């Protein structure tokens, strides 16, 4: 089963009307079949919220112009069993890093990319389900919290353990040779506290890391298993600190999720990406300033059409440059 509706309210949004409208956009972009404005009495009768009804009405008029063209949302399958608990908001934080996810309460055995946060470890059959996916060529992405909760059961896949030690980090590196070595030094927005994941060199590949003193700590690890692979993302103790990973590290993380997607975002956190099976995408910035970003698009895409502004944007070298404005949606049709 799944929830096919959505609702939002105006409370605590008077400081910025955009914060109210964003709730509406997110509900509609997820293609909820029913939208409830809560509470209608407040919106109509309470002078505090007198501006909310006209602006949300204008929003509905705007979205009516293109919502029917978008098709169905697509994203990496994010499995969380009905009674699973742990890292409860991680999907929201990853979404704010520009990673489209499609939530599932049943294990998505037919999907090629599967995301498992800590709550997925509450499925007593999760190890056998993961094995089947990877033996059939699938990519499974897990969090450090999933590794911690699964405990010794995770050793079935790779020799990685969640240690009791922490590290405060602010400088990072990525790998340009699929994990053979790391290179570069990229400074995060601010220091981030992460768990130290223990792993054996040459048993697993480090795709992104954080620098310590004469050492480094893994941020993204990957290992082959059967015809597939498993990747591990280190989640900061404060999940919101994912936003403070530098662009280069975020690009590594997005790449894990994006191999089945029509486009992958390259840019800072705070930029959302919505993907659809029709070949449309929406890019929306929640940053408080303008920002230039890039979409890495699927092979064969030669241009994008902004269907709101009726502007064509050429693709060069598989990349589409975009100028984002706070709270403004770029609704794009990717054209081959």
Regions of interest found by a model, annotated:
Residues 43-44, 109-111, 149-150:
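Short secondary-structure capping/turn micro-motifs that flank functional sites
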Residues 27, 76, 114, 283, ...:
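Hydrophobic, well-ordered secondary-structure elements that form the walls
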Residues 91, 101, 105-107, 117-336:
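A conserved amphipathic helix/loop scaffold
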Residues 33, 111-114:
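Conserved acidic residues
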């Amino acid at each position: 089963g799944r929830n096919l509706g959505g609702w939002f309210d105006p409370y605590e949004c008077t400081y910025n009307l955009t914060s109210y409208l964003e709730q509406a956009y997110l509900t509609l972009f997820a293609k909820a079949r029913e939208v409830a404005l809560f509470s209608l009495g407040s919106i109509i009768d309470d002078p505090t919220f007198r501006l909310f009804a006209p602006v949300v009405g204008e929003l509905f008029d705007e979205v009516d112009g293109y919502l029917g063209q978008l098709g169905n949302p697509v994203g990496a399958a994010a499995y969380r069993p009905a009674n699973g608990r742990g890292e409860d908001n991680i999907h929201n934080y990853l979404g704010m890093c520009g990673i489209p996810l499609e939530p599932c309460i049943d294990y998505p055995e037919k999907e090629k990319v599967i995301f498992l946060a800590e709550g997925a470890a509450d499925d007593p059959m999760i190890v056998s389900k993961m094995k089947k996916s990877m033996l059939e060529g699938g990519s499974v992405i897990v969090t450090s919290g999933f590794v911690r909760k699964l405990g010794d059961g995770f050793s079935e896949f790779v020799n990685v353990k969640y240690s009791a030690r922490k590290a405060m980090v602010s400088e990072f590196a990525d790998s340009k040779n699929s994990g053979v070595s790391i290179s570069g030094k990229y400074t995060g927005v601010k220091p981030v506290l992460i768990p130290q994941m223990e792993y054996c060199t040459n048993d697993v590949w480090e795709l992104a890391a954080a620098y310590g003193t004469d050492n480094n700590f893994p941020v993204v690890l990957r290992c082959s298993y059967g015809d597939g692979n498993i990747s591990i993302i280190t989640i900061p103790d404060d999940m919101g600190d994912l936003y403070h990973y530098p662009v280069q590290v975020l690009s590594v993380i997005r790449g894990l999720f994006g191999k089945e997607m029509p486009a992958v975002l390259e840019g800072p956190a705070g930029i959302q990406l919505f993907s659809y099976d029709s070949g449309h995408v929406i890019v929306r910035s929640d940053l408080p300033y303008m920002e230039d970003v890039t979409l890495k698009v699927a092979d064969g895409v030669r241009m994008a059409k902004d269907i709101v502004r009726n502007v064509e944007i050429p693709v060069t070298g598989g990349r589409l440059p975009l100028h984002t404005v706070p709270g403004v949606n770029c609704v794009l049709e990717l054209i081959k």
